[in-house]
Amino acid sequence: MSTLDAAFGALADPTRRAMIQRLRSGEATISALATPHEMTLSGAFKHVRVLQDAGLVRSEKRGRTVWCWLDPKPLRKVADWVSHYEAFWNSQLDSLSAHLSNSRGKEG
């Protein structure tokens, strides 16, 4: 599986997207990532593992606590892919808008 495929797969889950959102503000413990979702630590760790496998999150055990933080490189690949298609669709919508404007002008 490519890095991009793994990233999209990991981001397909709303809980993992919320964890990514939380990690935007800085590193967090597994416990802090689990709390808003009322899930067990093992459940949160499974989500973090998917994010790690996709390269989106890194972690480190400090004492008895596991800390997590974002790795921006795979997110940049996702953003680049999305922006490519955003430009394409914006162009298509602009063409459609011009076509509709011309069609209305011919009817009147």
Region spans (language model):
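C-terminal regulatory/oligomerization modules of transcriptional regulators
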Residues: 1-3, 22-41, 50-58, 73-108
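Short, Lys/Arg-rich nucleic-acid/phosphate-binding segment
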Residues: 61-67
